[in-house]
Structures are given as C-alpha cells and as structure tokens.
C-alpha cells in the first residue's frame, strides 16, 4: 500500500511509497494497495474528446485524447524533459489537474535533474509544498528488478486516487515504459520461466496490459498518460516497443534536426501521429488545416535537395511560395514555454486550439505572405506574430 492524495504532491517516493526527499514522513495520508483491477466497462467514458495542451504543434497535428496514451520518442538533449514539464504546468493551469511522474528504471541523474528543474520552474513550490502540481515516484536503474517492475503500478495508483476520489484530470508520465518490460524480463528469468521471442518473458502482453488498462477515462475523471518509449537498437519490431504501440493513441516524435535549427518544442510535424486526427472527431476545419500544414511541410521536405545544391533560384514561382510558407509554418509551430522562461527570457504562451487553427488558416492561403518569417518564430497566437512583425519593421 502506498500513500495517495494531496499530501503526495511535491514529494518524491520509492516503489513502497516511502518518501526519499529528506522532508520527513507524509502527513496523515490515505493509502491504497498498488495491485488494483482496471475500471469496469460500465464506468468507462466512451466519448472521444481532445485533451487540449496549449502547445500548438501537438494540438493541431497530433492531438492527445483525454484519457489516452501517448508515446514520446526522442534521443538525449532534444527537449523531452522540458516538454513534460510544460505539460505538467499547463494541465495544472488550464485544467486544474495534477500530475504524477513515474521514473521507471532510468538514470538517477535524470530523476534528480527533473526534480531540480521542477523546483526551478515552480512546478514544485518549495516555499509552500501544498501548491505543487506533481508527485514523483522513482525506481531507478540501481534498484532491483522487482522494484523497477512495480514502480509503474505505484505511480498509477497515486494517479487513480486523483481521478476516482478527487474527480480530476490527471497526467501520468512514465519514463521509460521499455524499462518496465525489461524489469519484467529479469524477474521472469529469476523465476526460471521459459523465455519467449528475443528472450522476453512469456507474460509480456499480460504484464503490459495490467498496467495500461488501468490508465483510462472514467465518468469521474481521466488519466492521460505520456510514456517515453526507448526503442532498442532502433528496431520498432522488437517485442517490447511493438507491444507498447498496441496501446498508444498518439505518438509525439522529437527531432534532432528541428532542435538544431532552434525550433522548440522540437516536435516532428510529419512523424508525429494521432488516432484523434479524424474529421468526425476534431471537425472538418481542424482536419483540413492540419492536412494543409502537413502537405506544405512535406513538399518543402521534398524540395530540400534542390535548395541545397542549385539553390532557391532554380525553383518555380509556385515552389518558391510553398517554401516561404513552409518556413513560416515551421517557425509558427515553435512557441515560448512557461517552464523555459528562466532560460529564454520570453514569457510562456498557452495557445487555445481555435486560435492555433485560425493562425494556420491565415498562413496557408497566403494572407500573411508579406510578414517576415522571423515574426512567426517563438510567438503564441497569430496576432502576436503580426505585432512582432510591426515591431521588427519599426526597429529595422
């Protein structure tokens, strides 16, 4: 049994629910057992609704489902942690929700970095711990496999309390879902079970299901889960990532190329996918805008080789226009984050979905062809881009 409820916010726990942050015991808290059954079918919320994050590139091109599961793919240093912290911040401000972050078999240094950065960006409020927005549960690489295998369940139990008892929207982060499978494989070997494909445990599907099926929307509230997925040797057909994909509703892929260009969040607009991007779910307007953005960016990608060697002058007039708009779109997909204010010096922006769609609807047909592309870089909505353009002209 582990402590649950408001008293867990701002604290760090191990797999047994013991605080490990040297801030003393958790005060008068309720406890829940970590082994619980998934909600019954009758309790599930079957309505498909979008979970607005306030991050333009995510909401427009690969929207998250309320109570869905999202896979987060990206190497080291492309902004996974910052994206996770921005989501924690936005769910607290826009949805009045809370977050639980489970560190499953990752480096202790990364857990420490996340803790320090959450304190720096005020996601964990050191002065008044009760105002914190996240509870952290860690079972890192140095722990025995049993702890790493169960820490995901500890985190989801804490999230379930906020959903079922407090009736709130909860974000559950799991970093890294692959390590959960890896720990299960180690335990399976220790128990002397016959391994299945690629040496994984024979119970791989059941184990993954027992964790994933608990992460869902009920009529009371929702748990939306964002899971970092490590792909061993970049092989997507490996049983561990392949089993994970079966449960995901959306994928957010972070690109090193975009990070190198200075476009943050470095979410790849063409590689990120979502089952929610259907006209009967998001509406025709959103769907058409998203497809238009993707087509423009895809054409720009195809023209890159020509631009790299003979140069822009060799392109047709139409293609040159496409390139100019694609570069505007690429920059408009960036935005300043609240949690990165400390580093960038520019205030964070939360952009609602209708504002996001409106902005891209103006760029696509060429209404803003007269704006310099720099004006749409690191701004919130399209009005700010116009204001920035005016400021650039006045200054220039």
UniProtKB/Swiss-Prot annotation:
Gene3D superfamilies cross-referenced by the UniProt entry: Bovine Mitochondrial F1-atpase, Atp Synthase Beta Chain, Chain D, domain 3, P-loop containing nucleotide triphosphate hydrolases
Pfam family, one: ATP-synt_ab
Compartment(s) of residence: Plastid, Chloroplast thylakoid membrane
Membrane topology: Peripheral membrane protein
Reactions accelerated catalytically: ATP + H2O + 4 H(+)(in) = ADP + phosphate + 5 H(+)(out)
GO BP of this protein: proton motive force-driven mitochondrial ATP synthesis
GO CC terms in record: chloroplast thylakoid membrane; mitochondrion; proton-transporting ATP synthase complex
Keywords: ATP synthesis, ATP-binding, CF(1), Chloroplast, Hydrogen ion transport, Ion transport, Membrane, Nucleotide-binding, Plastid, Thylakoid, Translocase, Transport
Top class in the EC scheme: translocase
Major location category of this protein: plastid
GO function term, MF aspect, one: ATP binding
Subunit structure: F-type ATPases have 2 components, CF(1) - the catalytic core - and CF(0) - the membrane proton channel. CF(1) has five subunits: alpha(3), beta(3), gamma(1), delta(1), epsilon(1). CF(0) has four main subunits: a(1), b(1), b'(1) and c(9-12).
Family: Belongs to the ATPase alpha/beta chains family.
HAMAP family assigned: ATP_synth_beta_bact (MF_01347)
Protein name: ATP synthase subunit beta, chloroplastic
Source organism (scientific name): Adiantum raddianum (Maidenhair fern)
Species classification: Eukaryota, Viridiplantae, Streptophyta, Embryophyta, Tracheophyta
């Amino acid at each position: 049994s582990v402590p649950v409820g408001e008293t867990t916010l701002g604290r760090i726990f191990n797999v047994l629910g013991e605080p490990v942050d040297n801030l003393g015991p958790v005060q008068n808290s309720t406890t829940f057992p970590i082994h619980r059954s998934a909600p019954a079918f009758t309790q599930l919320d079957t309505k498909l609704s979008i979970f607005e994050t306030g991050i333009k590139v995510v909401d427009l091109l690969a929207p998250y489902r309320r109570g869905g599961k999202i896979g987060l793919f990206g190497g080291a240093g492309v902004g996974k942690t910052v994206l996770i912290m921005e989501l924690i911040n936005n769910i607290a401000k826009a949805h009045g929700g809370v977050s639980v972050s489970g560190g499953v078999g990752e480096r202790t240094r990364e857990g420490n970095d996340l803790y320090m950065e959450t304190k720096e960006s005020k996601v964990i409020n050191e002065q008044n711990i009760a105002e914190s927005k996240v509870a952290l549960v860690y079972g890192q690489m140095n722990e025995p496999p049993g702890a790493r295998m169960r820490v995901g369940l500890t985190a989801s139990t804490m999230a379930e309390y906020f959903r079922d008892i407090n009736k709130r929207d909860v974000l559950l982060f799991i970093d890294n879902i692959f390590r959960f499978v890896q720990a299960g494989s180690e335990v399976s070997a220790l128990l002397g079970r016959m391994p299945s494909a690629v040496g994984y445990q024979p119970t791989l599907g059941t184990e993954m299901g027992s964790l994933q099926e608990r992460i869902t929307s009920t009529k009371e509230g929702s748990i939306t889960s964002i899971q970092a997925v490590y792909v061993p040797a970049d092989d997507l057909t490996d049983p561990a990532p392949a089993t994970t994909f079966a449960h995901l509703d959306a994928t957010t892929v972070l690109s090193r190329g975009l990070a190198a260009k200075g476009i943050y969040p470095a979410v790849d607009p063409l590689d990120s996918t979502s089952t929610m991007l259907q006209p009967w779910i998001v509406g025709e307007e959103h769907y058409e805008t998203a497809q238009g953005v993707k087509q423009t960016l895809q054409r720009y990608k195809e023209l890159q080789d020509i631009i790299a060697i003979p140069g822009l002058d060799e392109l047709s007039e139409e293609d040159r226009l496409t390139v100019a708009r694609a570069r505007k779109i690429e920059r408009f997909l960036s935005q300043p984050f609240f949690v990165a204010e400390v580093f960038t010096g520019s205030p964070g922006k939360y952009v609602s979905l209708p504002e996001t769609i409106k902005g891209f609807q103006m760029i696509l047909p060429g209404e803003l062809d007269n704006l310099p592309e720099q004006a749409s870089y690191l701004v919130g909505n399209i009005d700010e881009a116009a204001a920035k353009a005016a400021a650039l002209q006045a200054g220039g």
